[in-house]
Every structure is written in C-alpha cells, then in structure tokens.
C-alpha cells in the first residue's frame, strides 16, 4: 500500500489507494479546500485520481503556476458549458490554455457580436457561481466516440479518430449536462473559476489549415483571484494605449495595406528610426569584430533542397520561376552565409569568422496571424553566423552573450529570462559532441553570472541553443535573442577548413540573433517607450518654435546650427499660437522644443521645454547643443537636466 512522500520530506502511510484530495484532507481542511490537483512523481494528475503505489506528491493550489494553468483550462470548459446552453447547436473544436488565458474554437451558425460575448460571459458566471463539482470519468475509446456522436460533436469525433488510439481510455469531464474531453487535469469544483473575462473573437481554421472550415475563436483570460484579474486588465488597458499600431499611425511612422499583407511601408520618420537602430547594431558589430556581408534574397530551389528547408519548410517559403528554374525567396540568411564562407580556401587560422547581415527575409505567414510590426511576412534580420572550431565554441558563445546584454541594456531592458535547450531524441552527432556543446553553452552562461533554466529535449536536431526572452515595462515576454549551435548545415553545404593537421574539417556554425527582426524590435520599442523614443532614436529630436514673425530669421539660423551639429531638427514658423504649436509637437513626442521670443533673440538664448512638459529655462544655444550632442552620443534613456 502506498507511502506518500511530501515536499518537506515527511511521509504518510496508507493501507488503501488515495487521491491528492484525500492526502490534502489528511493534512488539514484548509489545504483540502485549496487543492486543485496533485503532482505525482513530477506528473500532474486530477485531485480525484487514485495513487496506489509509493510516490512523491505535491498538492497543487491556485498559488502554483500549474494551478493557475489548470484554472484557465477549466474556464475553457466552462465556456463550452455556457455556449452549449445558449446556442445548443454549437459544435466544439479545441480549447487550450495560452499565455494569461485560454481560447475555444467553435463552429456556430452566427457571427458572434460583442453583445453575444457579454451574454456568454454572464452565463459563465452564473454557472460558476453554483460551484458545481467537475466529475472525471475514464472511458473506452468507443464510449467516448458514442458520447460525442450522440451530441453531434463532429470535431471531437475527428480528434478521437485521428489522434487517439483505440486502446486509450480518454478522460471525459462532466460539467453537469456538458461533457468535454481532455488529458487534464481540471479543477474539482467550479469555485476555483470565478475570476475570468472574455476578451475578443477571431477567425481560425480547423487544424490551422486554410483548406478547412473557418471557425470562430473566443479568447478569455482567467486568474486565481479578483486582484490578479483586475491587475491584468489594467495592464491590458495600458498595453492598448501603447499599441505600436496606434502609435505608428499617430506619429506617421509606417503603414500596412491590403495589397501587400505583412509588408511594411516605412514613412520618413519610421525609416529614420530603422536607420538609427541599424547604425547602432552596425557599430556594435564593428566593436565585436564582425564582417558585414550581403547575400542574394533569392536562390535556386536546389540550394534549399540541399539545406533541408525544402522538405521541412517549403509551406513558409515564397517561390517564383524564370527560364524553367524555380527560385525561393529566402526565409533566412544562413545558407547564403555558408556560400560566402565557401569562397576561397579557409585555414584554422582564419577562424573564428564572424559574418553578419541585415538580411531582407520573407516568410509566408498565415494572413490571420499577421499583427502590425510584430508578425510580418517581409522583415530584416540582424542575423549573424560564426564559423569556428569546436575548441572555439565556448569563447564565441561567451562573446555572443556579452553582446546580447550590451545591446539590451542600451534600451533599458533589465529582466531577461534565459533558457538552454538541450538534445532532442532525434538528433545528429555523437553523445560526446552533445555533451561538450551543452557544457560549453552552460559554462558560458555561468561565466557571465547568468541564471538560466534547462529546456530538456527542446534543442534542434542539429544542436543545442540559448534563448533570451526580454520582459518589457508591462512584464510581457518577447523572445528575441538566440545563440544556436549547428553541426549540420556546414556539412550539408560542403563547408570546410584546413585544420592544424592539414586535413579538411567541417566548422561548427553558430547562428546568432539579438534583436530578432528589425521590424519587430521597433514594434517592441514603440510599446516599451509608448512612442517617447529616447532622443538618439527619435525621428525629430528638436523643434525650434517662433512666437511671432520677428524671430523667424533667428529660428532659421539656429536650425542650421543644430543641423550642422548633427541634430535632427525642424523649424516651426507657422502663424499659429505658441500653445497650439507646443501641444502639437508634444503629441508628436518630439523630445525638445526650443522656443524663441524677442527676449531669447536679444540674449542669444532659447527657452527649452521637454515633451513631458518640463521647463528647463532659458539657456545659451551652445550649451543646449553641447548637452544634446552628449545625450545623443551616449544613447541616454534620460533627457537632459539643468
């Protein structure tokens, strides 16, 4: 009979099979009331599942990340319960957990309106408020199929037919009269599911295939308590104010249009930001001793067959043909960089060779997934590939890590979550090679005093990788940086160098990205700064404003001085009230407004005002220029003080 070992090392002995809920009740009524599920020997199980062998058990509550995920998953079932009561002919597809919430894809014979969503949410609350028990039953495959056939649930039947073995015993979760199928676990009672909000709807193809029927996807968020929900909704409201699509339009940075889905039309001010960011990256490339190259944006399909992309990635590639040859527009830069490496004989003395490119790449992303600058079809990668020997891997990874943190700190990103993905089951190379590669990556992180978590089995088949996920001011996660070892591509494309023993050897290739894509990173920065770009990035850094026509010559003279000093400046000589002009440029997030009246002209000064409304007083022009140059040169995140 089972001996249950708890996280504190204490043990409880039973003469019969017990569930996590039984053990929680044995410990105390408070824990039993809070028990959502159990973690048995590392595996999550339902609170009602029986344990009949010796095991380690942790009781999962709403305070645990796993508990919150279970709450969200059960809220998806609650949505299904409610929608079937309101519109019984609805057919349920899939309802997984996502970041901060859940969704459910439904096949319903009406276009869901905002009023429908509000009605659905109300019914969900009414059901949850009854605190009904959720009953789990393990049944045979045929029993599950019969249950869904009786309810006309064609999508559930398809899941059973295509994804579940006839020998399996699927879990059916009974929410009163509503039944759903899931691996689980789920909450034992709906008292855990009171704090949720339905958010929006969108279209989604069944199985993600555009050849299939378009379903309606209903999104929601769910939390453990009222305070967490309110805090999240407040963050969402702030995120809406910072939406890069809104700010991009307000500041005239770029636009997208139907004739070129997922492609960016950069306007002058947006392109100025792009070029400044590019110049910053280019400066860092020089300091870290990279070559900058430029490969073709299109190559023969034969090349992509050699790399393996044609077999594994062709659905995401744009193609064209000419003179009976088929070409692929590149989705990534790496094959082109190997071709550059292959030109001319390379010696071990030439390594490491660090090759970077602002590569124009295109990927055929589904139209429904496109989202402003964050998800596009045409993008520019700040991509680099390092060709080195196995002995050089550790030092090169070390350098990559330093470069990542060096660049992120410039933008004020301090919270960076790092994960090391290790060997998958299907992989190339020997265990010894993987041992060394994983050890090199871990050692480089440790040498830089970086905390990281392992992701076992999540590496690519051709090598382990480090992922850098930065968190913005709203604590949203953006996976941008990657350091990926590649033991496959150089060999596939016949890359080699002459080693110390005068024999040809295949180099190790390190894929390195920091920003990820220029477009997406500009989107992230737009939201991080809410359009208040630091002065060095701002499209217009200074506007000089006259009060009356009598200061026009002085304004023009100052404008020329600032331009000659390398400052992006505009003169506003319009016949408008000074308050109107200041308000307009403040809304345009121009960092500094220099106001010139008769007093300033006479004294050879300017009245300096920041976009945040701070009055810095009347300053000498030379002092203003010097301080602005210093702020821009240092890429400061803070505006000047007097």
UniProtKB/Swiss-Prot annotation:
Keywords assigned: Aminoacyl-tRNA synthetase, ATP-binding, Cytoplasm, Ligase, Metal-binding, Nucleotide-binding, Protein biosynthesis, RNA-binding, tRNA-binding, Zinc
UniProt cofactor(s): Zn(2+)
GO cellular component assignments: cytosol
Known catalytic reactions: tRNA(Thr) + L-threonine + ATP = L-threonyl-tRNA(Thr) + AMP + diphosphate + H(+)
Enzyme's top EC category: ligase
Highest taxon of the lineage: Bacteria
Residue ranges constituting the TGS domain according to the UniProt record: 1-61
UniProt EC number: 6.1.1.3
Location(s) in or outside the cell: Cytoplasm
Keyword Ligase part of the UniProt annotation: yes
Protein's GO biological process: threonyl-tRNA aminoacylation
Annotated positions binding Zn(2+): 334, 385, 511
GO MF entries: ATP binding; metal ion binding; threonine-tRNA ligase activity; tRNA binding
Function: Catalyzes the attachment of threonine to tRNA(Thr) in a two-step reaction: L-threonine is first activated by ATP to form Thr-AMP and then transferred to the acceptor end of tRNA(Thr). Also edits incorrectly charged L-seryl-tRNA(Thr).
Assembly, per entry: Homodimer.
Protein name per the record: Threonine--tRNA ligase
